[in-house]
């Protein structure tokens, strides 16, 4: 007789294959239709809040795998907090101003020259259209990743109200007394003709001259030092093109300097290394303290101009000569020491990186007309030649040098009139400097990982004043009026408020398209003719750095609370968004804009190499979605250690897909097993094995939830996978098959196991829902009503872990016994003595086994019997805590229905199966 139809085999309509590629877009469309984000807000009304403030991606180009990593990670974090019962806010945003968009518009127009023929207002119109196009494109690409956010109300930095709030933040910084305008050397991109902030600087290798130049001491200086022979300070530089602008030579105030027998002056500590490298030769003729040189003069060998000798703490004696060429127009340290000694700031380089008329007017270079309009980098060789024998040594070398992040051309330091936020001034209302406020707030902030704290602290501690002005077209203008007669900038509050109101109504384009009469507050006290507009625009990092004000503090968005609970970005944002946001919030609010900062690494290929089209190792999100679906990408994010760089490749994605398949099939078998469950068995009536798995699940799920709450997803996923593979699938689902398939439908043992599985499904479902949201939502449709409880979708659930089940099950003892049993079983199978464990029985005097329900003990080992009778034919034995377990073949016949060896003969069913069949 075929007993298959009498078995309660698992059944469910939940598919083995997710068909993610086709099903995900359909499910997301249904979420859109149901306005799931709004539903999430309603479901957690009055609950504890959680605000993730989105760092805005740039509205230029399609999203790449780094964008996908970032947005998925944010989405997982937000959803974890949601399913933990919190009221979450996740308002996505876009950075819309700045150089990259301008460059794209230039390309469309056919180059810079054609762009320069257009009015600024027209250029800005084209930039605005370009950014708007990619906001829409990227929004759809992010939604395809399963990200749920306030997509209908994103923040876009070029929106009129947003631009007005960026401007208001600028005005607030000015009111705090931190905004200054001054001529100061800044990173300058001659290719893009604009100043850059530190965050816009990248370092690449560059070949440069290494040149040692002798500056003769003036006769007066030699007389004061009692030197009767040739004497020249030797400076070392890698930028010969800055020698025309030299006005000083800096020495270390704590060092001794020597005059060599060959007539050169260098730091005493460096003489031996200079001699060894054959840059100099000679012995010590005289020794001096640095202080003796202060304010004496040397002569520039290029143009004969005097160069004042000054003392500066910035001078190091680890390499070079200890005598530092100082050109205040071309370096931050040079500028600072120049302020102390009132050195002239000479700036002979124009915005394109070419020498201007200053070299002719001030006689900075012999035959200056030959250099006029010539690019500085093309002038080095000729300048070296002009200095003749004063060049002591010259060579070439490669070193790391600052480059423009967009054009990848080498930058220069160039003194120009710019707007700065002073980080070492005290904002009005504070007794601390802006830098000190920021450093103090860094200490109060949570960091994930903790190493981020020192990284941000170091950057805050060492950064110079923030240059916030740019000489470009597309950005929020530094919309101040300047009085023509005096140069004074109008910072009257009513004037500033009026300008902000105009921007809110017409956008910041109004600064360029509207006449001064319409932009000026009527009671300003000046006529339009008496004023001129400041034409610089704001650094785009100011835009994004002020989003805490425009998004969290304004009433324009339902975006959560200030301070945000978390900022999440790549590790490069310590020098970017984390820092710019900190300084602006510290300036205006005197505190950080965030309570926590999470940083992740970058995406690399499986060899750890950076992705590039030339290498052919780029993994595009679109490609992954077409081949696997977003759930596989989301599982990859959650299973990767984001603290370092994240490897991704076809083979890694295949492994992620395999892990997804295992997880899905674990849910499928449990759903199939609980398909006919109508009531949950109370804990006190559950079997020992069911209590055991519930306690194991509770312990693991607690650990997973704790890891997820600390944003340690890789650890949480590891705990979860180990539990699913080992305890859940490896043991429990296997040992309950007999009861679930062969017992009567409503048998207490069967419904107990079903109840345990149902509770695990429900808790596990909300645990993985933040990561595999599509799958979790699909599973809800196949839950028995006893745990679905009429809920519409996954978003109606809140994570609640399983309760502790009071149990006498000795886990360590039973694990040890099972492990030793299966070691022997493996040998028996290899020797073909048995095919499966149901052919076996165990004979033991173990008290712990005797205390267990006999059937539960049999199920634990998946054997046909456990007894205390005499051993008939021993196949193997093992010992646990002094108790002997003997394995032997079952003597009863195999039941044709359940396959246990408990029947009287092979034609009859066992007692249990007979009862079920007769019922």
Curated annotation (Swiss-Prot):
Listed GO CC annotations: cytosol
Record Gene3D superfamilies: 1.10.730.20, HUPs, Ile-tRNA synthetase CP2 domain-like, Valyl/Leucyl/Isoleucyl-tRNA synthetase, editing domain
Residues annotated for Zn(2+) binding in this entry: 895, 898, 910, 913
Chief site of localization: cytoplasm
One Pfam match: Anticodon_1
Cofactor descriptive note: Binds 1 zinc ion per subunit.
EC number(s) reported in the record: 6.1.1.5
Subunit record text: Monomer.
Similarity section: Belongs to the class-I aminoacyl-tRNA synthetase family. IleS type 1 subfamily.
Domain free text: IleRS has two distinct active sites: one for aminoacylation and one for editing. The misactivated valine is translocated from the active site to the editing site, which sterically excludes the correctly activated isoleucine. The single editing site contains two valyl binding pockets, one specific for each substrate (Val-AMP or Val-tRNA(Ile)).
Function, in words: Catalyzes the attachment of isoleucine to tRNA(Ile). As IleRS can inadvertently accommodate and process structurally similar amino acids such as valine, to avoid such errors it has two additional distinct tRNA(Ile)-dependent editing activities. One activity is designated as 'pretransfer' editing and involves the hydrolysis of activated Val-AMP. The other activity is designated 'posttransfer' editing and involves deacylation of mischarged Val-tRNA(Ile).
Protein name: Isoleucine--tRNA ligase
Naturally occurring in which organism (per UniProt): Sulfurimonas denitrificans (strain ATCC 33889 / DSM 1251) (Thiomicrospira denitrificans (strain ATCC 33889 / DSM 1251))
Lineage, uppermost ranks: Bacteria, Pseudomonadati, Campylobacterota, Epsilonproteobacteria, Campylobacterales
């Amino acid at each position: 007789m075929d007993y298959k139809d009498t078995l309660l085999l698992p059944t469910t309509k939940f598919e083995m294959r997710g068909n993610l590629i086709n099903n995900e877009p359909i499910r997301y469309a249904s979420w859109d239709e149901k306005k799931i984000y709004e539903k999430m807000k309603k479901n957690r009304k009055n609950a504890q809040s959680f605000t993730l403030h989105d760092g805005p991606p740039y509205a230029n180009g399609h999203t790449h795998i780094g964008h996908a990593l970032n947005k998925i990670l944010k989405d997982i974090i937000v959803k974890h907090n949601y399913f933990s019962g919190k009221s979450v806010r996740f308002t996505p945003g876009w950075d819309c101003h700045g150089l990259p968009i301008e460059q794209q518009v230039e390309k469309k127009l056919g180059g810079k020259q054609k762009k320069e023929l257009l009015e600024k207002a027209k250029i800005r119109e084209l930039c605005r259209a370009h950014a708007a196009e990619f906001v829409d494109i990227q929004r759809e690409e992010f939604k395809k990743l399963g990200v749920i956010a306030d997509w209908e109300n994103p923040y876009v930095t070029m929106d009129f109200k947003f631009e007005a709030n960026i401007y208001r933040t600028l005005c607030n910084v000015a009111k705090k007394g931190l905004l200054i305008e001054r001529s100061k050397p800044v990173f300058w991109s001659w290719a893009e003709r604009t100043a850059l902030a530190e965050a816009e600087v990248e370092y690449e290798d560059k070949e440069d001259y290494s040149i040692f130049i002798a500056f003769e001491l003036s006769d007066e200086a030699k007389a004061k030092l009692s030197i009767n022979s040739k004497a020249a300070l030797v400076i070392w530089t890698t930028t010969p093109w800055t020698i025309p602008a030299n006005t000083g030579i800096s020495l270390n105030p704590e060092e001794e300097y020597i005059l060599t027998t060959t007539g050169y002056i260098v730091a005493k500590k460096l003489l031996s290394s200079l001699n060894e490298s054959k840059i100099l030769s000679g012995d010590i003729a005289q020794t001096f303290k640095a202080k003796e040189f202060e304010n004496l003069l040397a002569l520039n060998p290029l143009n004969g101009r005097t160069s004042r000798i000054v003392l500066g703490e910035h001078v190091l004696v680890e390499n070079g000569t200890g005598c530092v060429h100082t050109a205040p127009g071309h370096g931050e340290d040079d500028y600072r020491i120049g302020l102390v000694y009132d050195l002239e700031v000479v700036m002979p380089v124009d915005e394109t990186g070419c020498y201007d008329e200053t070299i002719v007017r001030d006689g900075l270079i012999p035959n200056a007309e030959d250099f006029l309009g010539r690019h500085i980098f093309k002038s080095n060789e000729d300048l070296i030649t002009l200095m003749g024998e004063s060049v002591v040594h010259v060579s070439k070398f490669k070193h790391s040098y600052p480059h423009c992040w967009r054009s990848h051309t080498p930058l220069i330091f160039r003194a120009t009139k710019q707007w700065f936020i002073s980080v070492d001034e005290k904002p009005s209302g504070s007794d601390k400097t802006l830098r000190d406020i920021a450093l103090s707030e860094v200490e109060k902030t949570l960091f994930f990982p903790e190493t981020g704290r020192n990284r941000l602290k170091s950057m805050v501690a060492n950064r110079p004043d923030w240059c916030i002005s740019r000489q470009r077209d597309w950005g929020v203008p530094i919309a101040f009026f300047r009085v023509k007669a005096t140069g004074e900038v109008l910072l009257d509050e009513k004037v500033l408020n009026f300008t902000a109101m105009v921007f809110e109504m017409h956008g910041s384009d109004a600064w360029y398209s509207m006449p001064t009469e319409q932009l000026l507050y009527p009671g300003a006290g000046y006529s339009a003719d008496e004023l001129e507009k400041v034409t610089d625009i704001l650094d785009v990092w100011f835009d994004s750095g002020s989003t805490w004000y425009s998004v969290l503090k304004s009433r324009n968005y339902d975006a959560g609370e200030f301070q945000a609970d978390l900022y999440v970005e790549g590790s490069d944002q310590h020098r970017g968004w984390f820092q710019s946001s900190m300084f602006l919030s510290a300036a205006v609010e005197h505190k950080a804009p965030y309570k926590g900062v999470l940083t992740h690494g970058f995406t690399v290929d499986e060899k750890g190499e950076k992705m590039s089209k030339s290498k052919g190792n780029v993994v595009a999100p679109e490609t992954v979605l077409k081949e696997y679906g977003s759930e596989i990408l989301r599982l990859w994010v959650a299973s990767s250690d984001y603290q370092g760089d994240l490897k991704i490749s076809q083979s890694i994605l295949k492994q992620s897909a395999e892990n997804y398949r295992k997880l899905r099939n674990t849910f499928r078998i449990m759903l199939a097993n609980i398909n006919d469950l109508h009531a949950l068995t109370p804990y006190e009536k559950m079997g020992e094995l069911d209590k055991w798995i519930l306690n194991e699940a509770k312990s693991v799920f607690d650990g997973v939830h704790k890891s997820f709450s600390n944003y340690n997803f890789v650890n949480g996923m590891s705990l979860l996978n180990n539990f699913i593979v080992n305890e859940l699938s490896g043991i429990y689902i296997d040992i309950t098959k007999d009861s679930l398939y062969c017992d009567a439908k409503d048998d207490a043992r069967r419904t107990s196991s079903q109840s345990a599985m149902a509770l695990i499904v429900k808790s596990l479902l909300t645990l993985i829902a933040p990561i595999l949201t599509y799958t979790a939502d699909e599973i809800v449709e196949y839950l028995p009503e006893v745990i679905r409880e009429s809920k519409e979708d996954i978003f109606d659930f809140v994570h609640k872990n399983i309760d502790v089940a009071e149990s006498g099950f000795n886990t360590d003892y039973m694990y040890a016994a099972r492990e030793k049993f299966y070691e022997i079983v493996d040998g028996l199978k290899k020797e073909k003595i048995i095919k499966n464990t149901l052919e076996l029985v165990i004979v033991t005097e173990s008290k712990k086994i005797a205390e267990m329900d006999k059937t539960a003990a049999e199920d634990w080992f998946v054997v046909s019997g456990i007894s205390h009778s005499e051993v008939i034919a021993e196949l193997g034995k093992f010992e646990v805590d002094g108790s002997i377990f003997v394995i032997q073949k079952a003597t009863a016949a195999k039941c044709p229905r359940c396959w246990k060896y408990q029947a009287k003969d092979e034609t009859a069913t066992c007692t249990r199966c007979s009862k079920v069949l007769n019922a």
